[in-house]
Amino acid sequence: TSEELNYIIEHSESKAVLVENKYVFEKIKKHHNDLSLIVFLDNSMHNPDKNIYSFDKFLELGKESLNGKEDFAINKSKKLNNENIATIIYTSGTTGKPKGVVLTHGNILHNVRVLPDIIRLKSGDKLLSILPIWHIYERTISYVTAITGCFTAITNKRDLKIDFTEEKPDIFISVPAIWINIYNTVMKNIDRKGFISKVFAKTLIKGSIRYTRNLRYQNNLIYIIGDETKEEKIKYYQIGIFDYIFHKLAQKIIYKKIIELTGGRLRLTISGGGALPMYIEDFVEAAGINLVVGWGITETAPVVTLRSPYKNYRGTCGTPIPEVTIEIRDKKGKVCKDGVMGVCYIKGPNVFKEYYKDKE
């Protein structure tokens, strides 16, 4: 909101801002005369007399100021260490005014260092990302792809379908809302069909999901809390011959179109930033797309846990990434038993330094 943006400018004592367009520019109208530099990312305004620059002109100024000294950034970086502040990212302010999360180079580099091995990124992989570029989720992923020699394409809801087809990504970085939307679109298209075709398609999907879920139980890839043993679950979830047939038919008739829609090369999709409903996971997995879920927050740069694509336990948000430990404690500070709710304590090199101007 305009109120949040103006608060962030004031609280951070910012002297320069980059704005997407005139709409955002108007939201910070009260600070137009206070700022030393305003850069328009869409190049829609350029007025140096008022300290306003288009992005392209701003880049030209940067090249001129370097004056052939391309090693300027490298020399600067040599003076940095893991404890130096890399960025301050403000939270959404859902529990009050936005808080400035102070992240160090060490915080971010920890995620950058450990994530490629978990998801087994290969040089030359192409990633498609629909994340907001100001979120730490997107920023960390961009750093990860840069150091592994991968290519990242940035998309949005409007262009997602076209970019899937044109970019043909190996990995899709997403949020739950995208997969919910894809699922709803498929179901709406099925509902528009005639009665027999509609019932047939839904029967195939239902049988296919049942087959995929039962296969998970047989392969011991569902986390179980409660009195039932894994042996009891495996015995109960036997794979039926008809479900197998339904699954194969669904692959040819329904899922094939989804695979084509996502470019035909999708090896993995990572979902974060919110809870993903189990029925969506069921559907995406049945369609033949390997989906992993992670959990994290801005204060941890951001990944804390992530499911492995090769040991993808459903019903969880994964195990702690390397060098990170988690404990769930009760109000007295004692570690809770499995399945008992409590407060999550996180320790690791990715945990932020402090809240800006709010160390308490």
Residue ranges and their predicted role:
Residues 1-61:
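Structural core segment of the AMP-binding/adenylate-forming
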Residues 1-2, 7-16, 125-126, 143-153, ...:
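A short helix-loop-beta submotif of the ANL/AMP-binding
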Residues 17, 85, 91-94, 127, ...:
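Conserved S/T- and glycine-rich ATP-binding loop of Class I adenylate-forming
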Residues 63-90, 120-126:
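Conserved pre-ATP/AMP-binding loop-to-beta segment of ANL
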Residues 86-112:
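Conserved AMP-binding A3 loop
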Residues 109-126, 133-230, 237-255:
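Conserved AMP-binding/adenylation subdomain of ANL enzymes
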Residues 130-135, 273-275:
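Conserved AMP-binding
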Residues 212, 243-360:
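Conserved AMP-binding/adenylate-forming
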